[in-house]
Amino acid sequence: MSMRMRKQVCKKQWERVRQAPDRYRQRMLKQAQGPGSLGLAGRLKTLLLWMSSSGLKKLDFSYLADIPVLEDLNMKLDQRPTAIIGQNGAGKTTLVKLLKGFVKPVSGSIYFHGEDISGKTVAMLAGSVGYVFQNPDDQIFKYNVMDEVLFGPLNIGMDPEQAKKEAAWALELTGLSGKEKENPYDLELYERKMTAIASVLAMDTDVLILDEPTIAQDWKGRQIIGSIIRSLSGRGKLVIAILHDMDFVAENFERVIIMAHGQVLADGTAKEVFAQEEVLKKARLQKPYVMQLSEALGYEKSYLTVEELLKDRMSLCAAIKLLKKSSITKNSCLKQGFFVFGHRKISE
Protein backbone atom coordinates (compact mmCIF):
# COMPACT_ATOMS: atom_id res chain seq x y z
CA MET A 1 0.00 0.00 0.00
CA SER A 2 1.37 3.40 -0.99
CA MET A 3 1.96 6.18 1.52
CA ARG A 4 -0.85 8.17 -0.07
CA MET A 5 -3.30 5.30 0.46
CA ARG A 6 -2.12 4.89 4.06
CA LYS A 7 -2.82 8.56 4.71
CA GLN A 8 -6.29 8.22 3.19
CA VAL A 9 -7.08 5.21 5.40
CA CYS A 10 -5.83 7.02 8.51
CA LYS A 11 -7.85 10.11 7.62
CA LYS A 12 -11.00 8.02 7.22
CA GLN A 13 -10.46 6.30 10.57
CA TRP A 14 -9.99 9.58 12.40
CA GLU A 15 -12.98 11.11 10.65
CA ARG A 16 -15.11 8.42 12.32
CA VAL A 17 -13.74 9.47 15.69
CA ARG A 18 -14.45 13.13 14.95
CA GLN A 19 -18.06 12.47 13.92
CA ALA A 20 -18.87 10.23 16.89
CA PRO A 21 -21.29 11.51 19.58
CA ASP A 22 -19.53 13.61 22.24
CA ARG A 23 -19.96 11.11 25.06
CA TYR A 24 -18.26 8.37 23.02
CA ARG A 25 -15.51 10.44 21.37
CA GLN A 26 -13.15 10.53 24.35
CA ARG A 27 -13.40 6.77 24.81
CA MET A 28 -12.64 6.22 21.13
CA LEU A 29 -9.67 8.59 21.27
CA LYS A 30 -8.37 6.84 24.36
CA GLN A 31 -8.74 3.50 22.62
CA ALA A 32 -6.70 4.80 19.68
CA GLN A 33 -4.06 6.77 21.60
CA GLY A 34 -3.99 5.68 25.23
CA PRO A 35 -1.54 3.44 27.08
CA GLY A 36 -1.72 -0.20 26.05
CA SER A 37 -3.75 0.54 22.93
CA LEU A 38 -2.77 -0.29 19.38
CA GLY A 39 -2.23 3.32 18.39
CA LEU A 40 -2.81 4.63 14.89
CA ALA A 41 -0.07 2.49 13.32
CA GLY A 42 -1.50 -0.61 14.99
CA ARG A 43 -5.00 0.25 13.80
CA LEU A 44 -3.71 0.57 10.26
CA LYS A 45 -1.92 -2.78 10.55
CA THR A 46 -5.15 -4.38 11.81
CA LEU A 47 -7.06 -2.86 8.89
CA LEU A 48 -4.55 -4.32 6.43
CA LEU A 49 -4.90 -7.74 8.09
CA TRP A 50 -8.66 -7.58 7.59
CA MET A 51 -8.33 -6.58 3.97
CA SER A 52 -5.81 -9.25 3.03
CA SER A 53 -6.66 -12.40 4.95
CA SER A 54 -10.19 -12.58 6.36
CA GLY A 55 -13.13 -14.18 4.60
CA LEU A 56 -14.72 -17.30 3.16
CA LYS A 57 -13.19 -19.40 0.39
CA LYS A 58 -15.13 -21.92 -1.71
CA LEU A 59 -17.49 -22.59 1.18
CA ASP A 60 -20.17 -25.27 0.92
CA PHE A 61 -22.71 -26.12 3.59
CA SER A 62 -25.85 -28.23 3.88
CA TYR A 63 -28.00 -29.42 6.76
CA LEU A 64 -29.07 -32.46 4.73
CA ALA A 65 -26.68 -34.21 2.39
CA ASP A 66 -28.75 -33.74 -0.77
CA ILE A 67 -30.01 -30.18 -0.07
CA PRO A 68 -27.25 -27.53 -0.35
CA VAL A 69 -27.74 -24.30 1.61
CA LEU A 70 -24.54 -22.47 0.63
CA GLU A 71 -22.60 -23.37 -2.52
CA ASP A 72 -19.08 -22.32 -3.48
CA LEU A 73 -19.37 -19.12 -1.44
CA ASN A 74 -16.46 -16.69 -1.63
CA MET A 75 -16.42 -13.48 0.39
CA LYS A 76 -13.78 -11.15 1.77
CA LEU A 77 -14.32 -9.53 5.16
CA ASP A 78 -13.05 -6.10 6.13
CA GLN A 79 -13.77 -3.53 8.82
CA ARG A 80 -16.70 -1.85 7.11
CA PRO A 81 -20.01 -2.25 8.98
CA THR A 82 -21.75 -4.93 6.91
CA ALA A 83 -25.47 -5.64 6.49
CA ILE A 84 -26.60 -8.97 5.05
CA ILE A 85 -30.10 -8.77 3.57
CA GLY A 86 -32.41 -11.17 1.77
CA GLN A 87 -35.61 -13.12 2.20
CA ASN A 88 -36.03 -15.88 4.78
CA GLY A 89 -34.20 -18.96 3.55
CA ALA A 90 -31.56 -16.99 1.66
CA GLY A 91 -28.76 -18.41 3.80
CA LYS A 92 -28.03 -15.32 5.91
CA THR A 93 -28.31 -16.92 9.34
CA THR A 94 -26.44 -20.03 8.21
CA LEU A 95 -23.59 -17.82 6.99
CA VAL A 96 -23.15 -16.01 10.31
CA LYS A 97 -23.54 -19.25 12.26
CA LEU A 98 -20.58 -20.57 10.28
CA LEU A 99 -18.56 -17.48 11.24
CA LYS A 100 -19.36 -18.10 14.91
CA GLY A 101 -18.70 -21.84 14.77
CA PHE A 102 -22.27 -22.96 15.55
CA VAL A 103 -22.14 -25.12 12.42
CA LYS A 104 -19.20 -26.42 10.38
CA PRO A 105 -18.75 -26.18 6.60
CA VAL A 106 -18.99 -29.31 4.46
CA SER A 107 -16.03 -28.00 2.48
CA GLY A 108 -14.08 -24.79 2.05
CA SER A 109 -12.45 -22.51 4.60
CA ILE A 110 -13.15 -19.53 6.85
CA TYR A 111 -10.15 -17.30 7.48
CA PHE A 112 -9.77 -14.71 10.22
CA HIS A 113 -6.60 -12.59 10.16
CA GLY A 114 -4.90 -15.28 8.11
CA GLU A 115 -5.92 -18.20 10.34
CA ASP A 116 -8.32 -20.94 9.25
CA ILE A 117 -11.06 -20.98 11.92
CA SER A 118 -13.50 -23.33 10.17
CA GLY A 119 -12.61 -26.17 12.55
CA LYS A 120 -12.70 -24.16 15.76
CA THR A 121 -15.41 -24.58 18.39
CA VAL A 122 -17.75 -21.87 19.67
CA ALA A 123 -15.75 -21.72 22.90
CA MET A 124 -12.49 -21.24 21.00
CA LEU A 125 -14.02 -18.34 19.05
CA ALA A 126 -15.71 -16.73 22.06
CA GLY A 127 -12.99 -14.12 22.52
CA SER A 128 -12.89 -13.06 18.88
CA VAL A 129 -16.42 -13.43 17.46
CA GLY A 130 -19.46 -12.20 19.39
CA TYR A 131 -23.03 -13.20 18.49
CA VAL A 132 -26.27 -11.56 19.63
CA PHE A 133 -29.35 -13.71 19.03
CA GLN A 134 -32.52 -12.33 17.49
CA ASN A 135 -34.47 -13.34 20.61
CA PRO A 136 -32.66 -12.11 23.75
CA ASP A 137 -34.47 -14.73 25.84
CA ASP A 138 -32.36 -17.37 24.07
CA GLN A 139 -29.27 -15.73 25.53
CA ILE A 140 -30.05 -14.21 28.94
CA PHE A 141 -29.89 -16.44 32.03
CA LYS A 142 -28.48 -14.40 34.95
CA TYR A 143 -30.54 -12.80 37.72
CA ASN A 144 -29.38 -9.22 37.24
CA VAL A 145 -28.13 -7.14 34.34
CA MET A 146 -24.58 -6.62 35.63
CA ASP A 147 -24.00 -10.34 36.23
CA GLU A 148 -25.28 -11.05 32.73
CA VAL A 149 -22.92 -8.51 31.17
CA LEU A 150 -19.93 -9.67 33.24
CA PHE A 151 -20.43 -13.37 32.50
CA GLY A 152 -18.87 -13.30 29.03
CA PRO A 153 -15.69 -11.30 29.69
CA LEU A 154 -14.92 -13.18 32.91
CA ASN A 155 -15.33 -16.56 31.22
CA ILE A 156 -12.93 -15.74 28.41
CA GLY A 157 -10.26 -14.90 30.97
CA MET A 158 -10.48 -11.12 31.06
CA ASP A 159 -9.02 -9.45 34.15
CA PRO A 160 -11.89 -8.75 36.62
CA GLU A 161 -11.12 -5.03 36.83
CA GLN A 162 -10.95 -4.74 33.05
CA ALA A 163 -14.17 -6.73 32.78
CA LYS A 164 -15.93 -4.24 35.07
CA LYS A 165 -14.69 -1.33 32.95
CA GLU A 166 -15.85 -3.02 29.75
CA ALA A 167 -19.22 -3.82 31.35
CA ALA A 168 -19.71 -0.21 32.48
CA TRP A 169 -18.84 1.01 28.98
CA ALA A 170 -21.23 -1.50 27.38
CA LEU A 171 -24.08 -0.51 29.71
CA GLU A 172 -23.53 3.17 28.98
CA LEU A 173 -23.41 2.56 25.24
CA THR A 174 -26.66 0.58 25.30
CA GLY A 175 -28.49 3.05 27.55
CA LEU A 176 -28.71 0.63 30.49
CA SER A 177 -26.67 2.56 33.05
CA GLY A 178 -28.60 2.55 36.33
CA LYS A 179 -30.25 -0.81 35.65
CA GLU A 180 -27.31 -2.96 36.77
CA LYS A 181 -29.25 -4.63 39.62
CA GLU A 182 -32.47 -5.15 37.67
CA ASN A 183 -33.57 -8.66 36.76
CA PRO A 184 -33.44 -8.79 32.93
CA TYR A 185 -36.86 -10.44 32.83
CA ASP A 186 -38.36 -7.46 34.65
CA LEU A 187 -37.28 -5.28 31.73
CA GLU A 188 -39.14 -4.55 28.50
CA LEU A 189 -38.25 -6.61 25.43
CA TYR A 190 -36.19 -3.82 23.86
CA GLU A 191 -34.21 -3.47 27.11
CA ARG A 192 -33.58 -7.22 27.24
CA LYS A 193 -32.33 -6.94 23.68
CA MET A 194 -29.94 -4.18 24.78
CA THR A 195 -28.83 -6.36 27.71
CA ALA A 196 -27.95 -9.15 25.30
CA ILE A 197 -26.01 -6.70 23.12
CA ALA A 198 -24.18 -5.25 26.15
CA SER A 199 -23.17 -8.74 27.33
CA VAL A 200 -21.36 -9.32 24.03
CA LEU A 201 -19.96 -5.78 23.74
CA ALA A 202 -18.24 -6.23 27.11
CA MET A 203 -16.25 -9.17 25.70
CA ASP A 204 -14.44 -6.76 23.35
CA THR A 205 -14.47 -9.17 20.40
CA ASP A 206 -13.04 -8.24 16.99
CA VAL A 207 -16.32 -9.21 15.32
CA LEU A 208 -19.88 -8.54 16.50
CA ILE A 209 -22.73 -10.37 14.76
CA LEU A 210 -26.24 -8.97 15.28
CA ASP A 211 -29.30 -10.98 14.26
CA GLU A 212 -32.19 -8.58 13.55
CA PRO A 213 -31.10 -5.96 16.12
CA THR A 214 -33.89 -3.47 15.30
CA ILE A 215 -36.79 -5.82 16.08
CA ALA A 216 -38.82 -4.46 19.05
CA GLN A 217 -36.82 -1.21 19.00
CA ASP A 218 -38.42 2.22 18.88
CA TRP A 219 -36.75 5.27 17.30
CA LYS A 220 -34.50 5.81 20.33
CA GLY A 221 -33.43 2.17 20.36
CA ARG A 222 -32.59 2.32 16.67
CA GLN A 223 -30.48 5.42 17.30
CA ILE A 224 -28.61 3.64 20.09
CA ILE A 225 -27.88 0.65 17.88
CA GLY A 226 -26.64 3.00 15.16
CA SER A 227 -24.32 4.64 17.71
CA ILE A 228 -23.04 1.21 18.76
CA ILE A 229 -22.18 0.37 15.16
CA ARG A 230 -20.32 3.66 14.67
CA SER A 231 -18.50 3.31 17.99
CA LEU A 232 -17.31 -0.22 17.25
CA SER A 233 -16.26 0.77 13.77
CA GLY A 234 -14.22 3.60 15.28
CA ARG A 235 -12.49 1.04 17.52
CA GLY A 236 -11.49 -1.08 14.53
CA LYS A 237 -14.18 -3.75 15.02
CA LEU A 238 -16.30 -5.43 12.37
CA VAL A 239 -20.09 -5.36 12.81
CA ILE A 240 -22.12 -7.81 10.72
CA ALA A 241 -25.91 -7.61 10.95
CA ILE A 242 -28.77 -9.63 9.48
CA LEU A 243 -31.58 -7.22 8.73
CA HIS A 244 -34.94 -6.82 7.02
CA ASP A 245 -35.11 -3.08 7.80
CA MET A 246 -33.87 -1.45 4.58
CA ASP A 247 -34.03 2.08 5.98
CA PHE A 248 -31.78 1.17 8.91
CA VAL A 249 -29.41 -0.55 6.48
CA ALA A 250 -29.18 2.57 4.31
CA GLU A 251 -28.54 4.81 7.31
CA ASN A 252 -25.90 2.77 9.14
CA PHE A 253 -23.96 0.36 6.93
CA GLU A 254 -21.08 1.05 4.58
CA ARG A 255 -21.33 -2.38 2.97
CA VAL A 256 -24.48 -4.26 1.95
CA ILE A 257 -24.63 -7.89 0.80
CA ILE A 258 -27.75 -9.31 -0.85
CA MET A 259 -28.23 -13.08 -0.60
CA ALA A 260 -30.72 -15.42 -2.25
CA HIS A 261 -30.76 -19.22 -2.44
CA GLY A 262 -27.37 -19.51 -0.76
CA GLN A 263 -25.64 -17.17 -3.21
CA VAL A 264 -24.38 -13.58 -3.04
CA LEU A 265 -26.27 -11.54 -5.64
CA ALA A 266 -24.77 -8.15 -4.85
CA ASP A 267 -22.00 -6.76 -2.66
CA GLY A 268 -21.16 -3.07 -2.43
CA THR A 269 -22.16 0.22 -0.85
CA ALA A 270 -25.81 0.80 0.00
CA LYS A 271 -26.21 3.19 -2.93
CA GLU A 272 -24.63 0.72 -5.36
CA VAL A 273 -26.64 -2.25 -4.15
CA PHE A 274 -30.04 -0.56 -3.95
CA ALA A 275 -29.58 0.82 -7.47
CA GLN A 276 -29.61 -2.72 -8.93
CA GLU A 277 -33.27 -3.14 -9.87
CA GLU A 278 -32.99 -6.68 -11.28
CA VAL A 279 -31.07 -7.96 -8.27
CA LEU A 280 -33.63 -6.49 -5.85
CA LYS A 281 -36.43 -8.05 -7.87
CA LYS A 282 -34.73 -11.45 -7.86
CA ALA A 283 -34.13 -11.25 -4.10
CA ARG A 284 -37.68 -9.91 -3.53
CA LEU A 285 -36.43 -6.85 -1.69
CA GLN A 286 -37.61 -3.26 -1.70
CA LYS A 287 -35.54 -0.11 -1.73
CA PRO A 288 -35.44 2.12 1.36
CA TYR A 289 -38.59 4.25 1.60
CA VAL A 290 -36.69 7.51 1.11
CA MET A 291 -35.15 6.17 -2.09
CA GLN A 292 -38.60 5.11 -3.33
CA LEU A 293 -39.96 8.57 -2.49
CA SER A 294 -37.20 10.49 -4.25
CA GLU A 295 -37.67 8.38 -7.37
CA ALA A 296 -41.47 8.74 -7.27
CA LEU A 297 -41.07 12.53 -7.08
CA GLY A 298 -38.88 12.46 -10.16
CA TYR A 299 -35.64 13.65 -8.59
CA GLU A 300 -32.60 13.00 -10.74
CA LYS A 301 -30.63 12.00 -7.65
CA SER A 302 -31.65 9.02 -5.51
CA TYR A 303 -31.53 9.66 -1.77
CA LEU A 304 -30.92 6.93 0.79
CA THR A 305 -31.73 8.73 4.04
CA VAL A 306 -34.07 11.42 5.32
CA GLU A 307 -31.10 13.54 6.38
CA GLU A 308 -29.57 13.37 2.91
CA LEU A 309 -32.87 14.27 1.27
CA LEU A 310 -33.67 17.19 3.58
CA LYS A 311 -30.17 18.64 3.40
CA ASP A 312 -30.19 18.62 -0.38
CA ARG A 313 -33.76 19.88 -0.82
CA MET A 314 -33.34 22.65 1.76
CA SER A 315 -30.23 23.77 -0.11
CA LEU A 316 -32.27 23.80 -3.30
CA CYS A 317 -34.96 25.96 -1.66
CA ALA A 318 -32.31 28.39 -0.44
CA ALA A 319 -30.88 28.67 -3.94
CA ILE A 320 -34.30 29.26 -5.52
CA LYS A 321 -35.18 31.98 -2.99
CA LEU A 322 -31.86 33.69 -3.59
CA LEU A 323 -32.37 33.69 -7.35
CA LYS A 324 -35.95 34.97 -7.06
CA LYS A 325 -34.98 37.88 -4.81
CA SER A 326 -32.26 39.19 -7.10
CA SER A 327 -31.03 39.19 -10.65
CA ILE A 328 -28.04 36.98 -9.85
CA THR A 329 -26.64 35.15 -12.85
CA LYS A 330 -25.62 31.51 -12.80
CA ASN A 331 -21.92 32.42 -12.68
CA SER A 332 -22.32 34.80 -9.75
CA CYS A 333 -24.48 32.20 -8.02
CA LEU A 334 -21.65 29.72 -8.32
CA LYS A 335 -19.25 32.27 -6.86
CA GLN A 336 -21.51 32.65 -3.83
CA GLY A 337 -21.21 28.99 -2.93
CA PHE A 338 -23.69 27.17 -5.14
CA PHE A 339 -22.94 24.42 -7.62
CA VAL A 340 -25.04 22.84 -10.33
CA PHE A 341 -26.40 19.35 -9.78
CA GLY A 342 -28.35 18.08 -12.79
CA HIS A 343 -31.02 20.67 -13.53
CA ARG A 344 -30.94 21.99 -9.95
CA LYS A 345 -28.66 24.39 -8.12
CA ILE A 346 -27.62 23.08 -4.71
CA SER A 347 -25.88 24.96 -1.91
CA GLU A 348 -22.58 23.43 -0.76
Predicted segments, located by residue:
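The feature captures the beta-strand-to-loop junction immediately N-terminal to the Walker
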Residues: 85-87
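H-loop/switch region of ABC-family ATPase nucleotide-binding domains
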Residues: 243-244
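Helix-to-loop junction immediately C-terminal to a conserved catalytic motif
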Residues: 100
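ABC ATPase nucleotide-binding domains
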Residues: 2, 6, 10, 14-17, ...
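Conserved ABC ATPase "signature" region
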Residues: 161-179
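Conserved ABC transporter NBD signature motif
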Residues: 108-116, 125
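Conserved ABC ATPase "signature" C-loop
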Residues: 261-262
